[in-house]
Amino acid sequence: MSVYIIARVKIHDRNEYDKYSAGFSVVFKKFDGKMLSVDEDPTVLMGNWDDTRSVIIEFPSKKSALAWMTSEDYQAIAKHRDAGSTAHSILVNGLE
């Protein structure tokens, strides 16, 4: 069953975040991830959405998504994400 990671990101140091972005695709592809949406200015329909970037990504399984998140390669670039942004993310199951 496909799963989706939905992330909200507030970038506060573009230089650090760009280092994260530069290594992201290479690591992401190793785990069969698929980028569905990256939006710097999403339309808020309900509630507060103070973050500047919204991201939706797909993985073929929860196992694949968690393997990506915990991999050494991803953790090596995630330090730049953490230094350059404040992020919140959730993993949700797709409908089958």
Predicted feature locations:
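Electropositive, surface-exposed helix/loop patches at the edges of structured domains
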Residues: 68-86
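C-terminal end-helix/capping segment
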Residues: 82-96
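Short S/T/G/P-rich N-terminal loop/turn motif that feeds into the first structured element of a domain
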Residues: 1-54, 58-70, 74, 93-96
